[in-house]
């Protein structure tokens, strides 16, 4: 299916001059600002302050944080029961040596750059964009935007009219600059001793061969190509090959079930899917081709037939003989790709032409096809990577994320390669064959920048520190965290044990929808507070609003929104622009609503507090509660289900499911396992409930609405905080649920 530019004639555009008026505020107290008033966050940051106390504030709930607009009960503290770092003795300063060599070496330099990006975003981003290759430069108008549904359809455009290609800028440009012999990818297999590498010249040749195959089989500019691959080198190769010919790649995490994959195939209607026969992750072998076969059978029943299934023969995991095959549709990758030329003409595209679709969980249960375009995304990922990690040409960079998620798109593939970086790609599990595998890889490739998720940090914390300290790790100079708020104790372990108390941590906040980092420390610029994402990136104006959409200034808690557009912003939800507007721009008119809660302390540091909608963040993966509920009720013995998130010491959040069975069906451990298996099969193992709580009934209002607030309290055992239950149609249900809490 051809995917057109989101900037179609039906979307009217409200133009912006590209100028933002900064407002200087000297007030530290929380006060409400008019929703239409623009202000520069950098003007509100304090460089110096007097310490009133050396003690740490101990926060048990968000209600203990001050807010001029009243407390917002739906929000949770960063990690309940942990100290929020806010006092002088909990500030972590970069070393003088690090700051001296950093791209942004002081608070003053950061503030000057951020102020310029706010005062004149058109000039700021044009200067950066000019460092990349454009076949044709954009026109006089650098960007146009309308983020206010009251003024017309939501629309964002950056560098429209500019003609470029992101694959060319990732590969050809670097080869032409003399980096052809530089290692582009170090690939580390699941098993010890299994590895490979590609230089930028070799990577370009491999990309061109696959691109030529796709073109030869009818894939054209705007066509969707689904990629269901593990972390083989072929995954970034496939992404870049699609980008080279203007095709729109849709990478599906190779842990999603056949049903989830089929949903995505039906939505974007590709004629080609790329996969492999199997993969080994740790000691387990996963038959990916069987999952793809089942998905293609299902999508065919739903009216979408895929013509070609190009399958990589991963001989380390299985054999061809053990791979089910459908002649006429299935093609072995190695049998055909090597026959194609190693050069391929670039398809030049407009900056606003689609680059990729990436499906993310929504609160309604139907996955959302987030659509990113080419030019703005290219500039934003390259720039955020460069500054947030203080990237130098000698760095070796490793991000542990899978390319099935946005982090793998922006910070395994595009962002690093646009900077000519050497990237480590790891196929296996971080604790296989033992919990020291990560640090073995760090030493092997002399990794200097290591970017991972708090879930992995917390998991490795549980093992003896010797698994870390027996490795040198002297090459490390910058650490990074992504996917969810990192709790202060995990931050400190990461800093002290992994980084030997010398590596700054870029604790990044961003989303699939934002394309790149939005709030992040810049190593060398600011002292850090464990658990805080620190300050906004260039061109980003975060605001915290109350339930009525009023901006709150100073120390406060509330809903995190963004004022104004930025180059990396997604442009629409594929095929559903109305849902795009309803989900992200209608809750608070005039702003992009992140769906996250946030607090800001008296120094201006931002603290992300988790989702405020019906989405659970499990190990950095966003999972809609409605998706899990829909999977549970497919079980023949399940009458109804309600899912909430709970704290999990490793995953950040876990999935807690209240299940009502059909009349007369008894509770049993076998049934519990069967329900969990149903979710695994429907969505994937990562969405499996951590707890099934038997529920004779669910707490509902008289209008039939489930009171999830009460379910969250029961799940977290906060029984003294249930609040008013008198509005429930049957208040006795609550007592029944409490009685069954340990069954």
Curated annotation (Swiss-Prot):
Database matches in Pfam families: ACAS_N, AMP-binding, AMP-binding_C
Plastid listed as a keyword: yes
Transit peptide, UniProt annotation: 1-84
CDD domains: ACS (cd05966)
Primary location group: plastid
An annotated Gene Ontology molecular function: AMP binding
GO BP annotations, alphabetical order: acetate metabolic process; acetyl-CoA biosynthetic process from acetate; fatty acid metabolic process
Principal EC category: ligase
Keywords annotated in UniProt: ATP-binding, Chloroplast, Fatty acid metabolism, Glyoxysome, Ligase, Lipid metabolism, Nucleotide-binding, Peroxisome, Plastid, Transit peptide
Enzyme Commission code: 6.2.1.1
InterPro entries: Ac_CoA_lig, ACAS_N, AMP-bd_C, AMP-bd_C_sf, AMP-binding_CS, AMP-dep_synth/lig_dom, ANL_N_sf
GO cellular component assignments: chloroplast; chloroplast stroma; cytosol; glyoxysome; plastid
Active-site residues per Swiss-Prot or TrEMBL entry: 613
Catalytic activity: acetate + ATP + CoA = acetyl-CoA + AMP + diphosphate
Superkingdom of this protein's organism: Eukaryota
Subcellular location, record wording: Plastid, Chloroplast; Glyoxysome
Tissue spec: Expressed in leaves, flower buds and young flowers.
Cited function: Catalyzes the production of acetyl-CoA, an activated form of acetate that can be used for lipid synthesis or for energy generation. May play a limited role in the biosynthesis of lipids.
Family as reported in the entry's similarity comment: Belongs to the ATP-dependent AMP-binding enzyme family.
Protein name: Acetyl-coenzyme A synthetase, chloroplastic/glyoxysomal
Organism, scientific name: Arabidopsis thaliana (Mouse-ear cress)
């Amino acid at each position: 299916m051809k995917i057109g530019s989101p900037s179609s004639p039906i979307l009217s555009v409200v133009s912006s001059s590209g100028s933002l008026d900064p407002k200087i505020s000297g007030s530290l107290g929380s006060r409400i600002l008019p929703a239409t008033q623009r202000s520069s966050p950098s003007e509100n940051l304090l460089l110096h302050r007097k310490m009133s106390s050396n003690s740490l504030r101990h926060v048990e709930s968000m209600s203990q944080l001050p807010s001029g607009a009243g407390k917002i009960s739906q929000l949770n503290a960063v990690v309940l029961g942990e100290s929020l770092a806010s006092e002088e003795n909990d500030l972590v300063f970069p070393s003088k040596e690090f700051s001296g060599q950093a791209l942004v070496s002081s608070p003053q330099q950061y503030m000057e750059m951020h102020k310029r990006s706010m005062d004149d975003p058109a000039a700021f981003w044009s200067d950066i964009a000019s460092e990349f290759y454009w076949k044709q430069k954009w026109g006089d108008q650098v960007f146009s935007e309308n983020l206010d549904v009251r003024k017309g359809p939501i629309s964002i455009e950056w560098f429209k009219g500019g003609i470029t290609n992101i694959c060319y800028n990732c590969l050809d440009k670097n080869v032409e600059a003399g980096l052809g012999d530089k290692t582009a990818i170090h690939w580390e297999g699941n098993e010890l001793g299994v590895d490979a590498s590609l230089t930028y010249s070799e990577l370009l040749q491999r990309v061109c061969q696959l691109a030529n195959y796709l073109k030869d089989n009818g894939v054209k500019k705007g066509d969707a190509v689904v990629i269901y691959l593990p972390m083989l080198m072929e995954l970034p190769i496939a992404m870049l090959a699609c980008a080279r010919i203007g095709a729109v790649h849709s990478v599906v995490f190779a842990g999603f079930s056949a049903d989830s994959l089929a949903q995505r195939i039906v939505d974007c209607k590709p004629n080609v899917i790329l996969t492999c026969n199997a993969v080994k992750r740790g000691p387990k072998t996963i038959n990916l081709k069987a999952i793809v076969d089942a998905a293609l059978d299902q999508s065919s029943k739903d009216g979408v037939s895929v013509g070609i299934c190009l399958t990589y023969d991963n001989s380390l995991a299985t054999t061809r003989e053990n791979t089910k095959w459908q002649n006429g549709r299935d093609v072995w990758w190695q049998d055909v790709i090597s026959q194609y030329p190693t050069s391929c003409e670039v398809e030049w595209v407009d900056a606003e032409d689609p680059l990729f679709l990436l499906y993310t969980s929504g609160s309604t249960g139907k996955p959302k096809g987030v659509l990113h375009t080419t030019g703005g995304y290219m500039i934003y990922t390259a720039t955020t990577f460069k500054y947030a990690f203080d990237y130098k040409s000698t760095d070796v960079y490793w991000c542990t994320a899978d390319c099935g998620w946005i982090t793998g798109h922006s910070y395994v593939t595009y962002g690093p390669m646009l900077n000519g970086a050497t990237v480590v790609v790891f196929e296996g599990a971080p604790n296989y064959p033992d919990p020291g595998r990560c640090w073995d890889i760090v030493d092997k490739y002399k990794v200097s920048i290591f970017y991972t998720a708090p879930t992995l940090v917390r998991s490795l914390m549980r093992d003896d520190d010797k698994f870390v300290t027996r490795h040198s790790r002297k090459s490390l100079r910058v650490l990074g965290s992504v996917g969810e708020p990192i709790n202060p104790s995990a931050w400190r372990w990461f800093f002290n044990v992994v980084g030997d108390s010398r590596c700054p941590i870029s604790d990044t906040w961003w989303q699939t929808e934002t394309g790149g980092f939005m709030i992040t420390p810049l190593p060398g610029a600011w002292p850090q507070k464990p658990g805080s994402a620190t300050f906004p990136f260039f061109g980003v104006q975060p605001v915290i609003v109350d339930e009525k959409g009023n901006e709150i200034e100073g120390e406060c808690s509330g809903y995190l929104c963004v004022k104004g557009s930025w180059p990396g912003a997604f442009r629409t939800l594929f095929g559903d622009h109305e849902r795009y507007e309803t989900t992200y721009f209608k809750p608070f008119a005039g702003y992009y609503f992140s769906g996250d809660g946030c607090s800001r302390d008296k120094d201006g540091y931002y603290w992300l507090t988790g989702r405020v909608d019906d989405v659970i963040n499990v190990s950095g993966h966003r999972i809609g509660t409605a998706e899990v509920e829909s999977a549970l009720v497919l079980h023949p013995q399940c009458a109804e289900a309600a899912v909430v998130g709970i704290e999990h010491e490793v995953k950040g959040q876990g999935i807690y499911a209240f299940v009502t069975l059909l009349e007369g069906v008894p509770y049993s451990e076998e049934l519990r396992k069967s329900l969990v298996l149903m979710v695994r099969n429907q969505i994937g193992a990562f969405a499996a409930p951590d707890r099934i709580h038997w529920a004779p009934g669910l707490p509902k209002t008289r209008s039939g609405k489930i009171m999830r607030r009460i379910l969250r309290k029961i799940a977290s055992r906060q029984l003294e905080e249930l609040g008013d239950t008198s509005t429930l149609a049957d208040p006795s249900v609550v007592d029944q649920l409490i009685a069954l809490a340990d069954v």
